[in-house]
Amino acid sequence: MKRIAIGFCLLGLALAGAQQRMADRAGQPGGASADRITREVRHELVMLPYYGVFDNLAYSVNGGTVTLLGEVTRPTLKSDAENSVKHIEGVTNVVNQIKVLPLSPMDDRIRVAAYRAIYSQPGLDRYALQAVPPIHIIVDNGHVTLVGVVASKSDKDMAGVRANGVSGVFSVDNQLQVEGR
């Protein structure tokens, strides 16, 4: 008789746990977890065909709402980012706050010169070997912002110095992050 009572208690606890998990999933659209949505959003953004070193895409996930942030050089990249994220299971709303940088021949010249200055520097040239280099160069009306991740503080400082040495640059905002910090 005791064994039967213990068996029913264990069965009741198992059912209560399963019911709690179902309730947790019901609170999230489609049962999708925030971690899974975050991984899929990152994957979709990195896989965009025209996403490059002169673009910066960021995002935040809050429940089923994905907020897209950053700056891009092509208007089509802004809409492509929104469309690729919209179809992820569990995403109910996409807020697109991506800024399209203005067309400017001078900014284009600065982009190319900054790319050459940074990625031709011994020590920083190893970053250029990746499909999407980790140092993103954002140029907006002559103002350069460096965004991304580097291995050391000296790499961060060197990239800032190299970008600051480009002719026509008004200011450099070095927002590079050092791995592990």
Where do the protein language model's features map onto the residues?
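N-terminal targeting leaders
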Residues: 2-11, 17-181
